[in-house]
Amino acid sequence: MSIISIAVDAMGGDFAPEAVIGGLDFALTNLLDNKDVSFNIYGQESQVLPMLDKYKNVKEHSLFIDTPDIVLANDKPSFALRKRKSSSMWCAIESIKNGVTSGVVSSGNTGALMAISCFVLGTLPNIKRPAICCALPSKCERYFVILDLGANVDCSANSLFQFAIMGNAFAKAVLNVPNPKVALLNVGEEEVKGTDVIREAFLLLRQAESSINFCGYIEPINMLGGEVDVVVADGFCGNVVLKVAESIAYIFKSVFEKSVSSSIITKIAGLLLKSSMKRNFMKFNPKIYNGAMLVGLNGVVVKSHGNADKIAFAHAVKVAVNAARNNINAKIIHELG
């Protein structure tokens, strides 16, 4: 098996570079085959080298490239395009274009990541606006695809239509669903509900039913029920829904832990249920679903949460490695026709 080389933006995210380099170590130790993965790490020497000295395993499997600049969390995309060409994010993305790496992962500024990726890599044929896409678990022991998760806050009906096409292709390529059920996220299932843009997108998808299995609207309350394979939303709604779902998982865990420690009886019950609850919570643990692919780009770009710790970042790295190894982009291009 050939070696997969992944570019890593070591300076992106709230806890960089510690969470990034620590995440690479966790990925190498627990999630990946060390023998066929290497990393090109882009960042500031003064901050990254001490981390590499701390994590010897990462140092052995990586090449460090010193980059003088950083894309800041409050940088506007236009500013990043003009002024951040020497940043760790830019150089990491550019390594894909130059054929040095097969994918990139970053916890940095989402808008800047999208803008730089579009500028440097370009988009796939007939795709105007890439979207952030990931696979999430449902209660039915199956996964579903949701997009957009924050790349495009304000979308036209045609953009939502393209997201549906890309999500459909992603579900076929990644989840191996032969005929994905696609739905638009809305406040109700009736055709009259929603904004003008949502209703227009509904009509576009209804007209394309010969090429896409469109199932109409889906409400957030039914999103995790396993009824559909692809959920389409604008970046604002998609991002809000994702973060609410993640917070509910953490709240449920916290409430359960408090409940089982309230008395002797509940503590005993908690011990009896501990392994089962832990196993079930892990299915919905947001950390293991960190890492969303920017679909529609001419290259594998994976966005990690800005507040990701090392475990969460490690799972984003796994997403990038698997996407590159399985040549996901080629499969999506094939599905797009």
UniProtKB/Swiss-Prot annotation:
Reactions that this protein is recorded to catalyse: a fatty acyl-[ACP] + phosphate = an acyl phosphate + holo-[ACP]
GO molecular function, one term: phosphate:acyl-[acyl carrier protein] acyltransferase activity
Pathway: Lipid metabolism; phospholipid metabolism
GO cellular component: cytoplasm
GO biological process entries: fatty acid biosynthetic process; phospholipid biosynthetic process
Subcellular localization: Cytoplasm
Keyword Hydrolase included in the entry's annotation: no
Entry EC no(s): 2.3.1.274
Primary localization class, coarse: cytoplasm
Record's signal peptide: none
Coiled-coil residue spans: none
Keywords: Cytoplasm, Lipid biosynthesis, Lipid metabolism, Phospholipid biosynthesis, Phospholipid metabolism, Transferase
UniProt KW Electron transport keyword: no
Superkingdom assignment: Bacteria
Annotated family: Belongs to the PlsX family.
Known role: Catalyzes the reversible formation of acyl-phosphate (acyl-PO(4)) from acyl-[acyl-carrier-protein] (acyl-ACP). This enzyme utilizes acyl-ACP as fatty acyl donor, but not acyl-CoA.
Oligomeric form and interacting partners: Homodimer. Probably interacts with PlsY.
The protein's name in its UniProt record: Phosphate acyltransferase
Organism: Ehrlichia canis (strain Jake)
Gene: plsX
